[in-house]
UniProtKB/Swiss-Prot annotation:
Pfam families: Ribosomal_L17
Subunit: Part of the 50S ribosomal subunit. Contacts protein L32.
GO CC terms in record: cytosolic large ribosomal subunit
Domain of life: Bacteria
Homology family: Belongs to the bacterial ribosomal protein bL17 family.
Family annotation (SUPFAM superfamilies): Prokaryotic ribosomal protein L17 (SSF64263)
Gene label: rplQ
Signal peptide extent: none
Any one GO molecular-function label of the UniProt entry: structural constituent of ribosome
Any Gene Ontology biological process: translation
Protein's recorded name: Large ribosomal subunit protein bL17
């Protein structure tokens, strides 16, 4: 079994989509997407928050290599990471919204706790 979900896309498209989802999630604090995308986004976002909690230059550069906007990285290190300083993981929550009207895909809201 693979260690990640393929999401029905070639590798480059999948990575680009996940980078955009993680960036939007950290920028807005919550996103609405399908369940499998949310689960994949959650795992990456939690790793980014854990990196940001370290707070050193190397961690910032590692996050910058994945997150597409510098303002989001700044928000992650100055606002989000200090908020979770005492928490060991579990920074996100997934709420089920229901099926999407167009194709019946299960839609969820992914948000920061």
């Amino acid at each position: 079994m693979a260690g990640y979900r393929k999401l029905g896309r070639p590798t480059d498209q999948r990575k680009a989509m996940l980078r955009n989802l993680v960036t939007s999630f950290l920028k807005h604090g919550k996103i609405e997407t399908t369940e499998t995308r949310a689960k994949e986004t959650r795992s990456i976002a939690e790793k980014m928050i854990t990196l940001a909690k370290r707070g050193d230059l190397h961690a910032r550069r590692q996050v910058l290599s994945f997150v597409t906007e510098e303002t989001v990285v700044q928000r992650l290190f100055e606002e989000i990471a200090p908020k979770y300083a005492e928490r060991n993981g579990g920074y996100t929550r997934i709420y089920k919204v229901g099926p999407r009207r167009g194709d019946g895909a299960e839609v969820v809201i992914l948000e920061l706790v």
